[in-house]
């Protein structure tokens, strides 16, 4: 059921009172692969500390729909988020299948889909005021396709986007019109809410 949920919905949730060995789960999901380390380390605690937060996720602020780490090459394909103890009352994790949303978007907004397929967006993490400074930049279209013109990934993380490559004013307007139509579309697509 766990794998079927990942294949069908793009995620799976395990509710248990047991303390799990996260490395066993990762090795079971992706045998013979080592988990990818990030700027935060291989694993890390997310602790709500507004005064010293180096990431919006470390606060109690609402996070808009996004994908984590789009500036990595390659970006993570499977993420394991493990909540041992929720520090705050309330709050919710909202998950969306952006791949499915992109397929629906292509049907409803074919011109805008093509624009987001053809224009390059810059995803970046530039942060020097930290113990391990980072300057990561990755350029990708929002709707990434392979050589056979098949959609293989949706790149969506508005709050880590940098400048788009130079384009003329008409193209710039066209891009941002499509961008905001996609933003509204993804906001309205069905989602799953996980209460922690």
Describe each model-derived feature in a short phrase:
Residues 1-195:
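Active-site environment of non-heme Fe oxygenases that use a 2-His-1-carboxylate facial triad
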């Amino acid at each position: 059921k766990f794998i079927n949920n990942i294949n069908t919905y793009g995620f799976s949730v395990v509710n248990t009172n047991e303390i799990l060995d996260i490395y066993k789960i990762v090795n079971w999901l992706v045998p013979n692969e080592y988990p990818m380390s990030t700027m935060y380390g291989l694993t890390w605690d997310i602790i709500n500390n507004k005064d010293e937060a180096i990431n919006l996720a470390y606060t109690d602020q609402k996070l808009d729909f996004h994908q984590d780490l789009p500036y990595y090459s390659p970006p993570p394909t499977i993420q394991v988020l493990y909540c041992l103890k929720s520090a705050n009352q309330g709050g919710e994790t909202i998950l969306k299948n952006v791949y499915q949303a992109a397929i629906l978007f292509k049907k409803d907004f074919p011109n805008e889909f093509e624009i987001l397929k053809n224009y390059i967006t810059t995803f970046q993490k530039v942060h020097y005021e930290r113990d391990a400074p980072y300057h990561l930049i990755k350029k990708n279209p929002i709707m990434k396709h392979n050589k056979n013109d098949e959609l293989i990934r949706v790149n969506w993380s508005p709050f880590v986007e940098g400048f788009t490559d130079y384009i003329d004013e008409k193209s710039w307007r066209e891009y941002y019109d499509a961008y905001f139509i996609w933003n509204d579309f993804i906001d309205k697509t069905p989602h799953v809410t996980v209460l922690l």
